[in-house]
Amino acid sequence: MRILVLSDSHRDKISLMMAVKLHREADVVVFLDGEEDFQCEKMSSLLSLKEVHSVRGNCDFYSSLPSEETFACGGKTVFILHGHTRGVKHGAEELLRAAKEKCADIVLYGHTHIPKSEYIDNMYVMCPGSIRDGSYGIVDITDNGILCYTADLSREL
């Protein structure tokens, strides 16, 4: 299973569409900053066959999306959130505590705009950075394990 992870678009639909087109093979697409990013017609048509998960970000004041979500993917528990409600700009302690409470195997968060992928306390923890700046994340879940990494649109095109 492949998860494409996108965050902090700040309404840059062009970069979002480029990443989705580049990774059409992804089974799941995760948006870590709100529903407006995939509302346009072109984005919806690109994602029509994908499993999509989205949480609201710090600028999504009127969004009906949840601030956090947990879902199963490839036999693993994935915990997603934008991160601002868990203080990720000031450290990962609160984020990790919440993830442990959810029994998460994989934690995906945004808000910092800093691409980072780590293995902490038996969890894969990733911030994809900001797609507006060309940064996004990939999570591959296979029989051999989990691989989380960040990528850059400018290097992929």
Locate predicted features:
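Active-site environment of divalent metal-dependent phosphoester hydrolases
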Residues: 10-14, 35-40, 59-64, 86-91, ...
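Active-site neighborhood of phospho(di)ester-bond hydrolases with catalytic His/Asp-centered motifs
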Residues: 5-7, 28-34, 53-58, 79-82, ...
